[in-house]
Amino acid sequence: MKQIYLDNGATSFPKAPGVGQAMKDYIEKVGVNVNRSSYRATAEAALSTLTVREDLCRLFGAGEDPSYAIFTSGVTMSLNMIMKGALHPGDHLIISGMEHNAVARPATQLEAAGVAVSIAPCDGDGVLRLEEFEKLITPKTRLVVMQYASNVSGTIQPMGEIGAICRRHGVLLAVDSAQAAGHFAFDMRKLQIDALCFTGHKGLLGPSGIGGFVMNEEMNKALTPLIAGGTGSMSALLEMPPTLPDRYEAGTPNLPGIMGLGVALRYLQEVGLDALHRREMALTERFLSGLRGNEHIRIPGPADAKGRVGVISVDFLRQDNAEVAFQLEEQYGILTRCGLHCAPLAHKTLGSYPEGTVRFSIGYTTTEEEVDAAIRAIHDLA
């Protein structure tokens, strides 16, 4: 039985061509550190790392200075660094009712430490209610953190309007792009995003364990480094150096991961995000169209592909969703994710809490035949 991978919302598979080989080559043929020594190999590795930073800035529309592209282990660490680095007791934080636990759990920790937290409501499709969101802003509001696209329903937030509201009130905006980066083109400067947190292993088609955030100077001025340690620079200082990116990159970076991510970014440049997005949206619309009219399932989020990415949750009204997910693999070879998807806030907003849903997420290698097979399986099991 052929395996059909529809769990790209958890991690992309397969990775972009050449990612694994680039990582293997670095480990087996290069192996050096960066910013710690002065011989040629380490200088070449540092140059390769700089190129990846430049590619990230270009991809996200972040400006010309690659030092504002910071590497971390992924979007979760990046969000923690932004939220805990920018907020202090007495400050006010706003998140949305669609957030992943990568935002909700740090927010809960901050609330226990004296930061006021508000959850901005969203409509039944998961779209932020802009007027109600703006009314939550107070003189003490320091930071807004929002996901760009939902890992449950695929709902895309109106980030341009959100950015304009934040700028009008002088509030910093940080964005969780885990389900958006690599899926469609956007420009963080035009959207007025102060920090864009990303992960390498989902839409960017890179390896696990590498991600980061790209920020502007306003966010940099607001941040205190969350992690301190060696950087290979200004070693006489017992404080973190003021220069970027070293200020936020204590310890040895994940160099094999960075090299793999670099190959993935070049692949995205060669193929083109617009082409990938058009294909993903066509498959998403095919998927949604094939399920319309089935009264035994419910699909949270926008009714068609417009306004969402290729993440489709299905709530089986007559069956246990966990049992359906098991049968999808056992009978049809279809790999999905079932449950709350680390996003209880989103499921409460969408009306699928506490049961959760079965999530199907489309990738860059997903075919029409695979989508059709999933549609048939859903009808069979519903």
Regions picked out by a protein language model, each given a short descriptive name:
Residues 1-382:
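Pyridoxal 5′-phosphate
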